[in-house]
Amino acid sequence: MYNDYDLVVVYSDYSIVVRGGKVKFIAIIKNSYTLGQVIQQSRLQQGFSQRELAKKLGVSQRWVWEMEQGKQGLLMERLFKVLEKTGVTLSAEFETKDS
């Protein structure tokens, strides 16, 4: 899986892999908090403020903040319960921008 990377660091819920000058973050999403953290890190990496992302999505800045904080709604709660009970692993990844 990681054979073509220069450096791989694996933690319990995420990995950081480096190839050339690019860094890729790969996270296992077990709950809404982890999902929010990945979204936040990706947004920051892309240079967006919460307000800018909200405008792109057509939602309020508060909605983006709540998503990044892992605020659970009924749908999110059910989604993670279904994933847990069915043994499904949800993962997310993003790569740093070119310098």
Can you name each region flagged by the protein language model?
Residues 1-34, 89, 94-99:
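N-terminal flexible/basic segments that precede or flank functional cores
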Residues 3, 37-52, 56, 81:
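Short basic helix-loop element that most often maps to the first helix and adjoining turn
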Residues 26-27, 37, 66-67:
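Short, contiguous strand/loop micro-motifs
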Residues 31, 63-66, 79:
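Residue-level recognition of specific faces of alpha-helices
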Residues 58-72:
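Recognition helix of helix-turn-helix/homeodomain-like DNA-binding domains
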Residues 75-93:
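DNA major-groove recognition helix of helix-turn-helix/homeodomain DNA-binding modules
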